[in-house]
């Protein structure tokens, strides 16, 4: 029996991807056994740590990866995949992984798995910039942002720039290169319109089960939603200037 293509769930850190993993599992997807409390696939952790920065730099007109690096990256990917769900268990089943940082590697993943489905979760960049979770900025900010973008800016401003660049890059690639297999979901829509948004996700996954009980049981808006509204107008204005193009594209700004 042939191996099916994976489902991958990605986002910038702290967007709320756990709920998407729960929805996918209701739809029958095996997202692996070695996961943490947030449903992150732990077998990809070291792979992401090793390869996101060199791959991102090569995509950003930086030094190209050498043939040896490219071959090693592919080797490491398939080793992580085999640990995550062994190949025999993937045959003829619905499977995939939820690992937010996979969003940085979408072109690579699409090249290795041409028919993969990708769910891109977004959360308002103003919320993200003001979050205490800045792990992705710490790990990958230097690879994503230029020197001028990193200098003389607050952590929140750098976080907003990272949010803008990573999400725009993924959106551009998904829409252009895999339109039938790319779904973008705003976390705010999940919270405000749980049934309608869960239905969209189920349709994308080809699931025929009733989305209503899943939406009721799995979606609870966190208290941190819209936290940016508690900040000063000056702070928010600076963030909105930094992220304007993405905030507008993703309908967070008019």
Task: Tell me what each language-model feature is.
Residues 1-79, 215-221:
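PAPS-dependent sulfotransferase catalytic core
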Residues 1-8, 13, 133-136, 142, ...:
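PAPS-dependent sulfotransferases, especially Golgi type II membrane carbohydrate sulfotransferases
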Residues 7, 117-119, 183-185:
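Hydrophobic/aromatic beta-strand patches that form the interior of the parallel beta-sheet core
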Residues 9-12, 97-100, 187:
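Short His-Asn-centered micro-motif
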Residues 16-29, 109-113, 133, 184-209:
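PAPS/PAP-binding and catalytic site of the sulfotransferase fold
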Residues 77-105:
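Glycine-rich phosphate-binding loop used to anchor ATP phosphates in small-molecule kinases
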Residues 91-95, 137-138, 145-160:
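Surface-exposed cleft-lining segments at the edges of enzyme active sites
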Residues 98-99, 109-134:
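Conserved phosphate-donor/acceptor-positioning beta-strand/loop module used by diverse small-molecule
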